[in-house]
Amino acid sequence: MAFTEILPGIHYVGVNDRTTTRFESLWSLPYGVSYNSYLVIDEKVALIDTVEVSFGEQFIDNIRAILKDRPIDYLVVDHMEPDHSSSIKTLRLLYPEMQIVGNAKTLQMLDGYYGIHTLTREVKEGESISLGQKNLSFYMAPMVHWPEVMVTYCPEHKVLFSADAFGTFGALNGGILDSQLSLDHFWDEMRRYYACIVGKYGAPVQKALQKLSGLPIETICSTHGPVWQQKIGRVIGIYDQLSRYEGEPGVVIAYGSMYGNTAQMAEKIARELTVQGVKNIIVYNLSYADISNVIRDIFKYDTLIVGSPTYNGELFPEVGSLLQKISERCIPCRKFALSLIHI
């Protein structure tokens, strides 16, 4: 079996990005990020999603290393966000007979983004395409985290191609499968990815989890991060917990401070909570903290304390920015305290 072969006839052809510093120009990438794409090879060949176009040359090399001169029959587009779709025009030039498969919203976006409206095939909920011995079935997952999102399932191998669902920040360090990688940092990066990218859409994520719960799944192929096989239960559990907005016991103290007074207050609160036996306390100075880590931990823990001085008669700007991001993500079910110091 070739190194890229996840299962018989299913290959990884994705790429690592270790140069982009901020995902969506917002969220830091200390460990990089992967853009994952997969070939399913049978009597016919399907490619599941593409990669960021700036890595297109490497992507095409990965495909040709496996297919040689064999054509791609189908390109399945589970997600139209440009980090997964911007290589479509290149592929259409290289494989002009390739049929592009997507749902109605996908095909509208395909035309709007790239002017492609020929050799397309619309699929609906539960429909399948036969590749020979392997079949691909399609299930809609709208607003996880874009309106056109769907997932693709191969029942013969019990593989779910999950688009951005179950994804994580972090490039792949040599391996592809979870069994080949050190996963220590991926768990926090998964929570950070969910909180920043998917966090607003807990209800749609729950609907998708319920819809897919009846499928036997032994491999999850997301568009970001490792291919999951050994840790599927933990991965689904994290997404389930986060999308229910169920925090673990713990406290996030986030503050802004101009002259040290709010900082002193935050430290005293943290110490007193410790005296009272509270565990898992994290204190963030919002003028220095990576905001994506703060949002991650607000999703992770069940209590949030925010301290702010006033600034021009309003909240300190960094505190106001955090509260806006919390509001955007509709985070319910939290114990919350806000303290203002008028200085």
Label the predicted regions.
Residues 228-332:
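N-terminal beta1-alpha1-beta2 submodule of the flavodoxin-like/Rossmannoid cofactor-binding fold
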Residues 4-8, 101-222, 228-230:
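Metallo-beta-lactamase
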Residues 81-83, 107, 286-292:
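Short acidic loop-to-helix transition motifs that present clustered carboxylates
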Residues 43, 54-101:
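Active-site metal-binding motif and surrounding structural segment of the metallo-beta-lactamase
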Residues 48-50, 73-80, 100-103, 160-163, ...:
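Active-site neighborhood of phospho(di)ester-bond hydrolases with catalytic His/Asp-centered motifs
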Residues 3-63, 151-154, 158-162, 251, ...:
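Conserved beta-strand hairpin/beta-sheet module of binuclear metal-dependent hydrolase folds
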Residues 342-343:
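Conserved small/polar residues in nucleotide/adenosyl-binding loops
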